[in-house]
Amino acid sequence: MEINYQFKNGNEYAKVPGTSYRDNGKVRKKGVIYLGRVIDKEHHIFCNRERGIFSYDPDTGVFGKADETYISDLKSDGRKKQKILLDFGDSFFLDALIKSIGYDTVLNTLPYRNKDTLRAMVQYYLLCNSANDHAKIWYEGNFASILYPKANLTSQRITDFLESLGRPESTSAYFDAHVSWVRSICDDPAVLMDSTGLPNSIHFPLTAVSNHNGKISREVRMTTLVQRDTGYPLLFRITPGNIVDLSTVTRTLNELFLRDMSADFVIMDAGYYTNDNIEELYACEVDFITRLSSKYTIYNQIVKEHEPTLRRKENLVQYKDRYVYIKRVECKIGHKEHTAYAYLGYDVDRGSDESHKALKRAAQNQTSTADLHKTLENSGLFMIVSSLPFEEDGILPAYYTRQLIEQYFDISKGSSKLTPLRVHSEEALYGHLILSMIAATINVHIQNRTNCIYSNKEEIFMTLRNQKCTVYKSKITNAEPQKKANEFYEVFGIKCPLYIEQSNGQLIPVYHLEKPV
């Protein structure tokens, strides 16, 4: 099929001319295809508003995706003026921070060739909670457009980018590099494991109806490992929403072992406790702490035997602002009856609150006397099981380090664009989650470093965003950073330049005044 080319306002455009026919004496055209602007004539790469950058085979008439390695520039058509005043501080700070902590080496391992698109999208996930459709608007008004000039943030190209990022070979390469980076900072073998639901109404195999703790939803389930000492995520696994937590323990830990990172201690929620999982952990010499559900026989046996002597003075311990009675009991767990330690506890505040609510329901005739008695008996009781013999006043601090993973989920969902899901394929889902994990890792690092100064991450980026820059032909000057912005720069050891030289596509920071020659 022939392609016609023509120049207009200095730009080359292409179309398939179609064929002519007569209609009531008039010559008309049919089969005309406007391909848009020519990006690469030799390889038949074009660009238009409908498809973004794409390929077209003139022999078969088939449209395709432009190769992901394609980074040819799309020159401005002159109708849109380039912005000369841009948001500067936030993107300059993030670019310098990622390089200073060595995380750019992790990003470089991802096989997506247009690294400008990758880095720009990482910044977008860190700085904006809007849909990806708005990424180009943000990019055009931010210094990121100078840092990453070859980034292509059109809507269709972002979809292609996410699908490429989510391919198995890409996710595996990322996890390998990321785990290696975390290990270079801290080799703590203690990990936290938990899962969270990602609600999703789009139909693909990973979406399923979930009943998690009594909450019914259509979702994808994400199981995550977090390093205890640093709070950094290590990796995640995705399962359909109807896969229960207890079946994911061994496979999730195995993903970590495959990357030569050991784990000799794992803290889990109650949903992961089964005899099979306990046997696997003992076989691999992995110690553990987990909460034990009241549905297990061993729970009820220990309560029956030891609850009458639990609330005694010698068993009362303080944990932060809570007072809890705790009694350690040696027990046998698993198919092989391994020696472990159960910590039977009674939370005074929680027991009082649950009893008050039960009495209120009973007063409204919403519960029977038998049910009320059972509720009052069990109010405030809980049990933690561990393979290690912690002291009674040490088990709660050890167990509640798992709040780190809950904080990580809060960071991921609140500051790293984890939810809502706006993807239509499994590959795009994985690509989105990889970007969210990258953003969450940087957010965790920022939180760890600034916890003593500012707890609100948004305050950091909004303060930095107030620092603008002016783009000239060969220089980029930036305004004076505010006092708080200077504090952030100082905490992270980042020096803000006086101006930035643009020379042969390179950005050269200049920190001192130079007299013109």
Predicted segments with their positions:
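Short, flexible loop/turn motifs enriched in small residues
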Residues: 9-12, 214-221, 229, 377-379, ...
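Acidic, metal-coordinating catalytic cores used for nucleic-acid/nucleotide bond scission
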Residues: 267-276, 294-297, 427-429
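Short, basic/hydrophobic alpha-helical segments
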Residues: 180, 246-263, 275
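An anionic, glycine-rich sequence signature occurring as long contiguous blocks
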Residues: 218, 235-238, 284-398, 466-517
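Short amphipathic alpha-helical "interface-anchor" segments enriched in bulky aromatics
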Residues: 394-422
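Dynamic "connector" segments at or just before major functional cores
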Residues: 1-192, 196-201, 224-237, 242, ...
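Basic, amphipathic alpha-helical segments enriched in Lys/Arg and hydrophobic/aromatic residues
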Residues: 425-446
